[in-house]
């Protein structure tokens, strides 16, 4: 049985003094939790992976995505299932709109703004606002072009609202659907680093159309040069958002396939903007010419001269 003296605790005031007295004693170093160990075992990260993280903006997206995956999903036939697609606040919507207007080179729009919570609230109302902006601005533009003509009578063209709605919503849903199917097909052939869901692609396309709302309002200016400059600015901003977002999803594919995909995305976006400008704003110069009626005296004079 151990002696009583062996069970007594001894208080060590100075570790250095104790080590001097017992040089062969075993020491244990407990590091402070806030300090980073100087030496860590493990292989360093490759430069390629660091490039992917920098391009995709992977700061805290893994944690957010993990927490988002823990949410319980309701059946698709219930109202709660679709309610989750509109579960965003004003700050998130404004932040995503700002991201679509100020694209950051080398950063991914999905990873920075959408990945944690893709929504349909922003894309739905952006498309609705764009529809009315194009239709109303197109009517006002036609009115200003013919303003001052005695024979011109303004008639509102309400059919432009339905045409604009069909065009905008078809583009905002059918093009993402086709792109999502294409990416899924290519992902089965080539293991890509990045994959997007259908809702994420719809979200990207919806927010990328926001720049066309102020552009459509400024298209009222009856100057073709100004209109085309506005088209190029809007196309450059929104097209760069789409290109930088979807390039990481196709860059591991065949080089020609990747470039053809990005070029197709930009060309379809250009076709939408140019088509809207040409149809809704570039009206014919004169749809009707002033008609003149001949008086009886003029008819008699013409008969005598012949």
From Swiss-Prot:
Matching InterPro entries: Yip1_dom (IPR006977), Yip5/YIPF1/YIPF2 (IPR039765)
Top-level taxon of origin = Eukaryota
Alphabetically, the GO molecular function entries are: small GTPase binding
Return the GO cellular component terms, semicolon-separated. Golgi medial cisterna; Golgi trans cisterna; late endosome membrane; trans-Golgi network
Membrane-crossing ranges are 120-140, 163-183, 201-221, 228-248, 257-277
The molecule here is called Protein YIPF1
Location comes to: Golgi apparatus, cis-Golgi network membrane; Golgi apparatus, trans-Golgi network membrane; Late endosome membrane
Q: Which Pfam families match?
A: Yip1
Naturally occurring in which organism (per UniProt): Pongo abelii
Q: Which gene encodes it?
A: YIPF1
Question: How is this protein organized at the quaternary level?
Answer: Interacts with YIPF6; this interaction may stabilize YIPF1. May also form a ternary complex with YIPF2 and YIPF6.
Bias-annotated ranges (Polar residues): 15-29
Cytoplasmic topological domain ranges are 1-119, 184-200, 249-256
GO terms in the biological process aspect are: vesicle-mediated transport
Which stretches does the entry tag as region Disordered? 14-62
Q: What keywords are assigned to this protein?
A: Endosome, Glycoprotein, Golgi apparatus, Membrane, Transmembrane, Transmembrane helix
Q: Where is the composition biased (Acidic residues)?
A: 50-59
Which ranges sit in the Lumenal compartment?
A: 141-162, 222-227, 278-306
